Regions:
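Active-site microenvironment for binding and transforming phosphate-containing groups
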Residues: 2-310
Length: 310
């Protein structure tokens, strides 16, 4: 695992050292792959907003996307500074400002954001322009939705994280997208596969056409689980337990959610070369990324965002 001393610079290159920038992010990477990079963006007031992006998704030319960091917002204390949760005790106006900054930095319409309602399900909802603003400007009229899909340009899919796995889906043939939240419960119940199926049912998506990304989340070295969780994964991944579980010999296991989600997407028909997997762990990088485990629950939320370009 290497540490990259990363200045935020608007660049299409990999995470790199730009020490002349205004502040430095020392991101610890689990490997040297170039799956994602940090881009320095700006809100309308000129404030810097660093966003993590995937070259594989950008190469489609069809989407705006990002994964947020803790930096660039106005929240304080344990929520400092880019907290994207209205429900964890932060000041509502601060959170609204943070969402405005994200939208401005991405160049997407704030009023077209659509939120999940995450409860560790595998429910995927098809959203349209009629859903614009739900979660951020008005109440959602749906519950227990951990994944969103759409084929409407300009609608910003939004999901939220602090160790769980973000899953991005782009169908360049049918011009459709999906964004899902997959913690250990979602993963053991194959949320990635459920999202692929939802795209197939709604838009005729062929799995082999999909371009996918597995976003920043907790790594195998940081994610210790109990025997009952390990048993559930053993049942869900028969014959492949050793690819995703490390037995510590004390009734505890280290769980690899990244590899598990790679297997799920591959099993669903996504080509391995069409899957970009994060090399950033939220728990290893809790100074810059919110982590439930590292903070013992005293934290805000990160956000994943995905929009079809008009």
């Amino acid at each position: 695992m290497g540490t990259v001393r990363c200045g935020m610079k608007k660049t299409r290159s990999n995470i790199r050292d730009d020490s002349d920038q205004e502040f430095i992010m020392e991101l610890k990477r689990k490997n040297d792959t170039d799956s994602l990079y940090l881009e320095k963006c700006h809100a309308a007031d000129g404030s810097e907003v660093p966003l993590l992006k995937y070259p594989l998704l950008e190469k489609t030319g069809l989407v705006e996307h990002c994964f947020s960091t803790r930096m660039g917002g106005v929240s304080e204390g344990i929520f400092s500074s880019m907290n994207l949760s209205f429900t964890r005790g932060d000041d509502k106006e601060a959170v609204e400002t943070n969402f405005h900054r994200i939208a401005e930095a991405m160049g997407v319409p704030f009023e077209k954001m659509v939120f999940t309602d995450q409860t560790h399900t595998t429910c995927v909802r098809k959203v349209t322009g009629a859903d614009a603003g739900k979660g951020v400007l008005r109440e959602r009229d749906y519950r227990d939705v951990d994944g969103l899909i759409t084929d409407e340009a300009g609608l910003v899919l939004c999901a939220f994280f602090a160790d769980c796995v973000p899953l991005y889906f782009v169908d360049p043939v049918h011009r459709a997208i999906g964004l899902s939240h997959s913690g250990w419960r979602g993963t053991v119940n194959r949320m990635g596969e459920k999202t692929v199926q939802a795209l197939k049912d709604a838009y005729g998506t062929r799995p082999e056409d999909l371009i996918c990304a597995i976003g920043p989340s907790i790594c195998v070295d940081c994610y210790e689980v109990s025997a009952d969780v390990a048993d559930a994964f053993g049942t869900a991944f028969p014959g492949r337990e050793k690819e995703i579980l490390r037995d510590k010999g004390n009734g505890k296991y280290q769980l690899d959610l990244w590899r598990a989600n790679e297997l799920i997407l591959s099993d669903a028909g996504v080509r391995p070369e069409h899957i970009a997997t994060t090399n950033l762990c939220t728990c290893c990088n809790d100074r810059y990324l919110f982590s439930h485990r590292a903070s013992h629950g005293k934290r805000g939320n990160l956000g994943a965002f995905l929009m079809l370009r008009p």
